[in-house]
From Swiss-Prot:
Its EC number is 2.7.1.12. SUPFAM superfamilies: P-loop containing nucleoside triphosphate hydrolases. One of its GO terms (biological process) is carbohydrate metabolic process. Keywords: ATP-binding, Kinase, Nucleotide-binding, Transferase. The keyword Nucleotide-binding applies. GO terms for molecular function: ATP binding; gluconokinase activity. The gene is Idnk. It comes from Mus musculus (Mouse). Pathway: Carbohydrate acid metabolism; D-gluconate degradation. This is Probable gluconokinase.
Length: 184
């Protein structure tokens, strides 16, 4: 496979996106971004109160992330982004930017990241396993009570998206090895 310019490590809260993403970036020598660092203060407060984010809450955040990816890809800097990217439309915004036009995954003419291919790494797992992880996590603004809302809107990647699916039941070395193998 031709090496992508962007690895998008996605999944629900507690799936291991930040841990896996940071490790992959370190192994590859790529830049790492954690999308959680770019949430507005309003979004953080809303989630901390147990209120799920709406599309309107997420779109400006996704557009900011798109701009970061676009900038780095234009500079030839490969990137690993850890981001929930729960819906297909959210992943499309990360690739294409904008929020006011219908998004089509097969419309490569409007794909600003076309010069830097994107590989989606979908970290999947059962509600019970991930909920158990969230109960162990301390100091994060996303409470375990919001996990069901994430599973409710989750649209796992599918063709024609460029993706691999890796189970969170695997160990961290097994997960990173699966991604590294997919990059060969």
């Amino acid at each position: 496979m031709e090496a992508p310019g962007v690895l998008l490590v996605m999944g629900v809260s507690g799936s291991g996106k930040s841990t896996v993403g940071a490790l992959l970036a370190s192994k590859l020598g790529w830049k790492f971004y954690d999308a959680d660092d770019y949430h507005s203060e309003e979004n953080r407060i809303k989630m901390a109160k147990g209120v799920p984010l709406s599309d309107q809450d997420r779109i400006p955040w996704l557009c900011t992330l798109h701009d970061i990816l676009l900038r780095d890809v234009a500079l030839g800097q490969p990137v690993v982004l850890a981001c929930s990217a729960l819906k297909k439309t959210y992943r499309d915004i990360l690739i294409r930017g904008g929020s006011d036009a219908p998004l089509k995954s097969d419309d490569s003419a409007k794909e600003p990241l076309a010069g830097g291919k994107l590989l989606v790494v979908y970290l999947c797992g059962s509600f019970d396993i991930i909920y158990g992880r969230l109960l162990q996590r301390k100091g994060h603004f996303m409470p375990p009570e919001l996990l069901q809302s994430q599973f409710s809107i989750l649209e796992p990647p599918s063709a024609p998206e460029n993706f691999i699916q890796v189970s969170v039941d695997k160990s961290l070395p097994e997960i990173t090895a699966a991604v590294m193998e997919a990059l060969k």
